[in-house]
Amino acid sequence: MSAKKLYQIILCNSIGIALFLSWYLPVDHGFWASMDRAVFFYFNQHLAESRFFLYFVAFTNFRAFDLVAGACMLLILLYYFFQQNSEGKRRIICIFITMALSTVAVKLLDRQLDFHRLSPTLYFTNIHEPVNFVSEMTGWNVKDSSTASFPGDHGAMLLIFTAFLARYFGRKACLAGMILCILFSLSRIMSGAHWFTDVAVGSLSLVLLSMSWVLLTPAANTVIKWLEAKLLFPNFKNF
């Protein structure tokens, strides 16, 4: 591993730790608390003011809507997949498998980080502040609350995808991943299922700390090469 890679790992870890501690150490999360409150109530009040916005937020917070995010991620990978020769196609499949394994590993780590943080809808309800629940206003079964919102698992998954795009497919792919990450993470924030900092602090710091060791060390490439050598693949010459 080169000195440049080591520097990048140290930088990513330093930013991740500093970001997390800026939220975790201050009493009541310091300046992040006022930002969280402002973001939540900005969107929450608009649920009552705009019927279109209400149903837009409701629609994007159906569990099934997560499939749309998955489909967009798959389309990006397929775009690069069909540009490759047979060997390149096999490599992209191995990159995808490695990314999936990394996501599972981070999810398992996430479960160990039990912060017991209520979503803003539940938090403000508990302290008797009026809150609009998307599920109550529409009668739809949507994601608008959580008893363990930090760190945001939805945001972490999208950030991992973006990190892999940046590492293996370049800047344009990374930009596409960032756009997806913002759009699909925002839906949970607008519904009140997550705080802004669940994603901006929790998901981001978790991915900076974990993916730097996966993608900036030989770890990911080692797994990819092992998969290329061990797995049987169809003949992609006709694709």
Predicted region positions:
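N-terminal transmembrane-helix/juxtamembrane module of multi-pass inner/ER membrane proteins
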Residues: 2-72, 110-142, 232-239
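Interfacial segments of alpha-helical transmembrane regions
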Residues: 72-112, 207
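Alpha-helical transmembrane segments and their helix-start/interface "positive-inside/aromatic belt" motifs
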Residues: 1-16, 89-97, 155-156
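Alpha-helical transmembrane spans of integral membrane proteins, capturing the lipid-embedded, hydrophobic core
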Residues: 17, 63, 67, 95-104, ...
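Transmembrane helix-loop junctions in multipass membrane proteins, especially transporters and channels
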Residues: 27-29, 82-84, 111-119, 192-197, ...
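Membrane-water interface at transmembrane helix exits
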Residues: 40, 44, 74-78, 106-114, ...
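Aromatic-anchored segments of alpha-helical transmembrane domains
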Residues: 18-23, 100-105, 180-192
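Membrane-embedded catalytic cores of phosphoryl/pyrophosphoryl-handling enzymes
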Residues: 2-8, 133-239
